[in-house]
């Protein structure tokens, strides 16, 4: 039993590639969590996908015992958090379980926009933020400049920040000592009735729902009768323990601890994230803990199984993923071109890619994705306001009074030498500059941009415009009236609902032309001409034709009368005419994805 004064709960805030997962590896090694043989790089990034892309997607937790220099043994609960902007809600959930956070900054690169955003989240939640300068072994490390930058941008004193190199292990023990000194111990009363917050849950095929919890009051023991507050259902706590990093049964979790609980819950919605676990006998009087605010999806796309037989498996897979990823939203949808599927809401393009890859890998599904769109507000002539997340559900142009698109405020940090390129890119994306602040080597830009322009490929474009040095963080501000139209794609006169886009009227001609040129390359040639048109309402803005293949029907006539050849050609002509009436064109999967790549 560890006293509260010797427990420290903390997480690490860092930008992508600033060495957060490597630092976690060093902590685990120093505290003897794993033997050297079991030590893999990035132990906590357990998903294959996380390792391949080198990013952290899911929050993980580890409990370590560290013998400090004052002779005491401290229990460190460390919760790993993602650094990418699409996963910022994962970060805020992890921070709920902590009293402090390490802000890890690369001493060569300096502060990045996402660390700033996550750092503010931590400060808002009342956490103690301890700055750490990492990658001190690199020749380009400039700790003095970066410390000044942390002070300038974030406003926390970094003059005595610990300097370390997670890769070589230099100074990592000093980080642990500093953390014990500066981060306060958890508060909580172990004799009070149980209250535990569910930080994360995932589905295990053998155990059912496994929940990661932070106990705030009381004690949770194996065999206790527990109640999940929102569902009011009672369960038996079958397994209780901690991750160090392997799951280890401890049979008891006390106030201040972070660990897991398995209660044989087989229903996926049985233990929602952000819920409170209490003891059955005090279930009525124990209040709920303040949970997390629900995040609203920013980007919507249709996902359809390639074969219709997979529809049920697809639904089960989505349900299991929503348990693990609270921000994923889905509802059934059917499309004339693609059959039955789901309309899913994501936090951003990276989130969408990750979810699609997880569905294809972990659940073995083949999926087709339609072009992602953001939510638009439409005011009709009757004065009612609709939210539209699917271009094919847009009302008729004649009945629309005005359309409003979502606007985001983007904070961009960019080195001065790349400022021109980044400003040019923001202007091209219909951005409005709000602020510009020069710091030692970087410039902080604030722009208001249409969300539709940001979610598509803005992140990649801004990285390439600045050679990878710019960083971006954005949040939704408001809906604003704009001149928007629906761009339809017609193939042989038939509208393909899955290819519709909502675009700004000024860009519609260019976008329409680019899109159908792209489609022309991807649709295979048939025995008849295929007309591909881009239209706004009834007005066609551009058209291309995929030429027919010609079969030489007169090849078998050696010499002979010309009327024989005419007869064969006439017969072919009639056949083509009939084929054109009945023939339908298969649109390949690549063509649906062409819509995403139109800008480039």
Curated annotation (Swiss-Prot):
**What is catalysed by this protein?**
GTP + H2O = GDP + phosphate + H(+)
Indicate how the chain sits in the lipid bilayer: Peripheral membrane protein
What biological-process GO terms show up in the record?
positive regulation of translation
Q: Reply yes or no: does the keyword Cell inner membrane apply.
A: yes
- Matches recorded under Gene3D superfamilies: 3.30.70.240, Elongation factor 4, C-terminal domain, Elongation Factor G (Translational Gtpase), domain 3, P-loop containing nucleotide triphosphate hydrolases, Translation factors
Gene Ontology MF annotations: GTP binding; GTPase activity; guanosine tetraphosphate binding; ribosome binding; translation elongation factor activity
Q: Where in the cell is it found?
A: Cell inner membrane
| Binding-site positions, GTP | 17-22, 134-137
One GO cellular component term of this record is: plasma membrane
Q: Does the record's keyword annotation contain GTP-binding?
A: yes
Q: Could you say which EC number(s) this protein's record lists?
A: 3.6.5.n1
Q: Keywords on this record? A: Cell inner membrane, Cell membrane, GTP-binding, Hydrolase, Membrane, Nucleotide-binding, Protein biosynthesis
Domain named tr-type G: residues: 5-187
Biological role stated in the UniProt entry: Required for accurate and efficient protein synthesis under certain stress conditions. May act as a fidelity factor of the translation reaction, by catalyzing a one-codon backward translocation of tRNAs on improperly translocated ribosomes. Back-translocation proceeds from a post-translocation (POST) complex to a pre-translocation (PRE) complex, thus giving elongation factor G a second chance to translocate the tRNAs correctly. Binds to ribosomes in a GTP-dependent manner.
| Similarity remark | Belongs to the TRAFAC class translation factor GTPase superfamily. Classic translation factor GTPase family. LepA subfamily.
- Which PANTHER family is this protein grouped with? TRANSLATION FACTOR GUF1 HOMOLOG, CHLOROPLASTIC, TRANSLATION FACTOR GUF1-RELATED
Database matches in NCBIfam families: lepA, small_GTP
Annotated protein name in UniProt: Elongation factor 4
């Amino acid at each position: 039993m560890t006293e509260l004064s010797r427990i420290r709960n903390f997480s690490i805030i860092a930008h992508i590639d600033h060495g957060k997962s490597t630092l976690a590896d060093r902590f685990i090694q120093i505290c003897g969590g794993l033997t050297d043989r079991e030590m893999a790089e990035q132990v906590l990034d357990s998903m294959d996908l996380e390792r391949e892309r080198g990013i952290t997607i899911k929050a993980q937790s580890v409990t370590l015992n560290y013998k400090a220099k004052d002779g005491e043994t401290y229990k460190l609960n460390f919760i790993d958090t993602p650094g990418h902007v699409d996963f910022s809600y994962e970060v805020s959930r992890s921070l709920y379980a902590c009293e402090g956070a390490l802000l890890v900054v690369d001493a060569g690169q300096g502060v990045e926009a996402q660390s700033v955003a996550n750092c503010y989240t931590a400060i808002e939640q009342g956490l103690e933020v301890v700055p750490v300068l990492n990658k001190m072994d690199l020749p380009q490390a400039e700790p003095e400049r970066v410390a000044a930058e942390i002070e300038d941008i974030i406003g926390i004193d970094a003059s005595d920040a610990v300097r370390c190199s997670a890769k070589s292990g230099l100074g990592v023990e000093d980080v642990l000592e500093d953390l014990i000194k500066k981060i306060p111990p958890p508060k909580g009363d172990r004799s009070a009735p149980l209250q535990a917050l569910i930080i994360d849950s995932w589905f295990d095929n053998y155990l059912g729902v496994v929940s990661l919890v932070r106990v705030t009051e009381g004690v949770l023991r194996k065999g206790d009768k527990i109640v999940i507050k929102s569902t009011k259902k009672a369960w038996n706590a079958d397994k209780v323990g901690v991750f160090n990093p392997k799951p280890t049964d401890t049979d008891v979790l006390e106030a201040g601890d972070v660990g897991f609980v398995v209660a044989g819950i087989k229903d996926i919605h049985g233990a929602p994230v952000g819920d409170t676990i209490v003891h059955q006998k005090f279930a009525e009087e124990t209040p709920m803990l303040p949970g997390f605010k629900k995040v609203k999806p920013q980007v919507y796309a249709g996902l359809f199984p390639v074969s219709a037989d997979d529809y049920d498996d697809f639904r089960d897979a989505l349900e299991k993923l929503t348990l693990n990823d609270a921000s994923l939203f889905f509802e059934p949808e059917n499309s004339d071109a693609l059959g039955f599927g789901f309309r899913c809401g994501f936090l951003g393009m990276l989130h969408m890619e990750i979810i699609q890859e997880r569905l294809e890998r972990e659940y073995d599904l083949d999926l087709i994705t339609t072009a992602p769109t953001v939510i638009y507000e439409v005011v009709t002539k009757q004065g009612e306001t609709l939210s539209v997340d699917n271009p094919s559900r847009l009302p008729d142009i004649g009945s629309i009074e005005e359309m409003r698109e979502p606007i985001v405020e983007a904070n961009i940090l960019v080195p001065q030498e790349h400022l021109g390129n980044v400003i040019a890119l923001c202007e091209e994306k219909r951005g409005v500059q709000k602020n510009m602040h020069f710091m030692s080597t970087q410039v902080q830009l604030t722009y208001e941009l249409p969300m539709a322009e940001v979610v598509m490929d803005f992140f990649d474009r801004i990285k390439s415009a600045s050679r990878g040095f710019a960083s971006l963080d954005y949040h939704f501000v408001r809906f604003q009236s704009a001149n928007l139209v629906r761009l339809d794609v017609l193939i042989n006169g038939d509208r393909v609902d899955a290819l519709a886009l909502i675009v700004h009227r000024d860009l519609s001609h260019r976008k329409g032309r680019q899109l159908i040129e792209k489609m022309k390359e991807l649709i295979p040639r048939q025995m008849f001409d295929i007309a591909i048109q881009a239209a706004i309402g009834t007005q066609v803005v551009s058209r291309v034709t995929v030429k027919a293949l010609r079969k030489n029907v007169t090849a078998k006539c050696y010499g002979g009368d010309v009327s024989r050849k005419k007869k064969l050609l006439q017969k072919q002509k009639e056949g083509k005419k009939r084929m054109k009436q009945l023939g339908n064109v298969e649109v390949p999967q690549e063509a649906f994805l062409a819509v995403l790549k139109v800008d480039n």
